[in-house]
């Protein structure tokens, strides 16, 4: 980050890392968070303010949006009556949600959201694969759920289909958590960058 008084990148999601049961996966997501562009930790979730609640519309807004999406996922994943995901799958889902908007304005910050940001962050993960011990199935799941997290909003401004639509339960779950965390009716309270319990 830019100044010595700012948090280290990996510290922003300390609470969220604790939701990941597997120590290696926890270390992997920290490694990947550290690779995200600095701007991710500073900017609002929406460049226009149109598509996210007020808590996500100021400094650190994208981090707050991400934290809310992770918290929604955790609450749903902790309720065995609502899902039948295995622990390993839950860990990958949490990893994906932490990373899903990591390159929202590109690798180098652009003025607006990059429509293809799910593909950009997926590419960043693939570039760092050799530093991760995820097997092929885990890597595929991580990339698949990030790439499709935009749901039905998968076309660029010219109407070209760019992003995959969620097709399986994992993709639909990650999309749902992202979608819900961006709803304007949400009024999540924060203490700094942490959700108040």
Predicted regions and their residues:
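Acidic/His-rich, divalent-metal-binding segments that scaffold phosphate/diphosphate chemistry
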Residues: 1-107
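Histidine-centered active-site/metal-ligand motif
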Residues: 65, 100, 117-118, 149-150
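An active-site-proximal "capping" alpha-helix that borders the catalytic cofactor pocket
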Residues: 69-72, 114-131
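Inter-helical turn/loop segments and adjacent helix faces that build the functional surface
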Residues: 80-84, 129-136
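Histidine/acidic-rich helix-loop-helix segments that form or flank divalent-metal centers
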Residues: 93, 133-195
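Secretory-pathway/luminal and periplasmic proteins that interact with or process carbohydrate-rich
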Residues: 101-108, 151-157
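Metal-dependent catalytic cores of enzymes that make or break cyclic nucleotides
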Residues: 109-113
């Amino acid at each position: 980050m830019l100044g010595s008084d700012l948090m280290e990148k990996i510290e922003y999601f300390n609470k969220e890392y604790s939701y990941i049961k597997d120590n290696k996966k926890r270390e992997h997501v920290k490694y990947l968070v550290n690779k995200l562009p600095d701007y991710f930790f500073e900017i609002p979730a929406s460049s226009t303010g149109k598509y996210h609640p007020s808590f996500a519309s100021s400094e650190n807004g994208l981090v707050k949006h991400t934290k809310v999406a992770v918290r929604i996922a955790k609450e749903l994943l902790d309720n065995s009556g609502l899902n039948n995901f295995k622990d390993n799958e839950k860990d990958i889902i949490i990893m994906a949600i932490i990373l899903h908007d990591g390159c929202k304005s590109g690798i180098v910050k652009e003025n607006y959201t990059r429509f293809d940001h799910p593909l950009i962050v997926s590419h960043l993960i693939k570039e760092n694969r050799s530093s991760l011990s995820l097997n092929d199935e885990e890597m595929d799941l991580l990339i698949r759920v990030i790439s499709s997290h935009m749901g039905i909003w998968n076309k660029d401004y010219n109407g070209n289909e760019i992003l995959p639509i969620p097709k399986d339960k994992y993709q639909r779950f990650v999309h749902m958590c992202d979608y819900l965390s961006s709803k304007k009716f949400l009024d999540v309270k924060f203490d700094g960058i942490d959700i108040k319990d």
